[in-house]
């Protein structure tokens, strides 16, 4: 099996990006160690702080954020970073080539129940000149690398540099990432969907109708049985989609009219969309490709629909219909 280093060399990834990927991968090993120790290390539970999203921070949110921030600040390829747990961008150096956006511990609410969590990251080119928030506001198409690390029964790294998606598994004996899937590919068709059904009454009409039709199974217009899956961590749900197909969505809702979207564009939706598209899937808001969005701010949120190409297309057809007229009585 190829090591991560050998694989990056064989793909012709340049030296500076290779260095940055190793920084992220090596830090993920430290995070994996912290996650595994859990209650034994006293890192479970919440802090008394909230992040910029207004979410209560878990102890491991803060710990993993500091791990990544410290590692990236020591990497001379990095110009700046943005994190879910940081209110503002962090300037690292004036000569780095890359900007890094990350969610240090996606699904952290799962930590206290010993369920799946992960790290998501996006790498963008650093523009010249003064570093400001606008330096980060680049469409997802500009990403030069993206990936996630899943901390589960085994620790796995999914990575793309624009040449497909490679999956690596951390060997616990050698502490090396080894290539276990050379090219992840999402099946075009699926019988699985992932959505938080507790929000059903708050969704827009297109998603209400789409999910209702899936639930009707063989007696509905889709004439096919579907199973629902929900891990409550984007990293886990997207990993399942990459591994065996499916559609994952966190759609627009009016539960809180001031926050119609849940997932963050820069360090959740964009990197996951890059991976999904590189594996042959589609990633959309319902109305436009996620990676075509021109960001307006670093913590911007968006609706997300991604996964198996034919099923995402079917969902998008519902979003193209006119729901403005009341049905005739």
UniProtKB/Swiss-Prot annotation:
Chain residues that bind Mg(2+) 1: 84, 103, 105
**Protein name stated in the entry:** Fructose-1,6-bisphosphatase class 1
Q: What is its main location?
A: cytoplasm
The protein's matches in InterPro entries, at most eight in alphabetical order, are given as: FBPase_C_dom (IPR044015), FBPase_class-1 (IPR000146), FBPase_N (IPR033391), FBPtase (IPR028343)
GO molecular-function term, one example from the UniProt record: fructose 1,6-bisphosphate 1-phosphatase activity
Q: Which PANTHER family match?
A: FRUCTOSE-1,6-BISPHOSPHATASE-RELATED, SEDOHEPTULOSE-1,7-BISPHOSPHATASE, CHLOROPLASTIC
Q: How is the cofactor bound?
A: Binds 2 magnesium ions per subunit.
The answer to whether the entry has keyword Manganese is no
Q: Which organism is it from?
A: Shewanella woodyi (strain ATCC 51908 / MS32)
Pathway this chain belongs to:
Carbohydrate biosynthesis; gluconeogenesis
Its quaternary organisation is: Homotetramer.
**Cofactor requirements of the protein:** Mg(2+)
User: Cellular component GO terms, alphabetically?
Assistant: cytosol
Q: Where does Mg(2+) 2 bind?
A: 103, 106, 268
Compartments, record wording: Cytoplasm
What is the taxonomic lineage of the source species? Bacteria, Pseudomonadati, Pseudomonadota, Gammaproteobacteria, Alteromonadales
**The protein's enzyme class:** hydrolase
Reactions it catalyzes = beta-D-fructose 1,6-bisphosphate + H2O = beta-D-fructose 6-phosphate + phosphate
Keywords, sorted A to Z: Carbohydrate metabolism, Cytoplasm, Hydrolase, Magnesium, Metal-binding
Biological processes annotated in GO: fructose 1,6-bisphosphate metabolic process; fructose 6-phosphate metabolic process; fructose metabolic process; gluconeogenesis; sucrose biosynthetic process
């Amino acid at each position: 099996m190829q090591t991560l280093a050998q694989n990056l060399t064989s793909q012709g990834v340049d030296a500076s990006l290779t260095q940055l990927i190793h920084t992220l991968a090596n830090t993920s090993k430290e995070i994996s160690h912290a996650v595994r120790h859990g209650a034994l290390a006293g890192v479970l539970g919440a802090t008394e702080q909230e992040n910029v999203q207004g979410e209560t921070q878990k102890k491991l949110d803060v710990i993993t954020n500091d791990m990544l921030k410290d590692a990236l600040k020591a990497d001379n390829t990095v110009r700046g970073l943005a994190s879910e747990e940081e209110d503002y961008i962090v300037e690292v150096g004036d000569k780095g080539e890359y900007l890094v956006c990350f969610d240090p511990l996606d699904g952290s609410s799962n930590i206290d129940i010993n369920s799946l969590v992960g790290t998501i990251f996006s790498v963008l080119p650093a523009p010249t000149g003064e570093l400001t928030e606008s330096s980060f506001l680049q469409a997802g198409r500009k990403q030069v690398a993206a990936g996630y690390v899943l901390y589960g029964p085994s620790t796995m790294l999914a990575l793309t540099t624009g040449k497909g998606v490679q999956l690596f598994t951390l060997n616990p004996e050698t502490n090396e990432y080894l290539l276990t899937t050379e090219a992840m590919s999402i099946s075009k068709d699926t019988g699985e969907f992932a959505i938080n059904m507790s929000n059903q009454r708050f969704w827009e009409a297109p998603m209400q109708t789409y999910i209702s039709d899936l639930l009707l199974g063989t007696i509905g217009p889709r004439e096919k049985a579907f199973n629902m899956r929900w891990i409550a961590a984007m990293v886990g749900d997207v990993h399942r989609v990459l591994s065996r197909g499916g559609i994952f969505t966190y759609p627009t809702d009016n539960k809180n009219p001031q926050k119609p979207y849940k997932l963050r564009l820069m360090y959740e939706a964009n990197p996951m969309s890059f991976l999904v598209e590189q594996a042959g899937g589609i990633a959309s808001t319902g109305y436009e490709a996620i990676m075509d969005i021109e960001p307006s701010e670093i913590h911007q949120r968006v609706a997300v629909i991604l996964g198996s190409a034919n099923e995402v297309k079917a969902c998008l057809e519902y979003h193209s219909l006119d729901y403005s007229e009341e049905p005739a009585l």
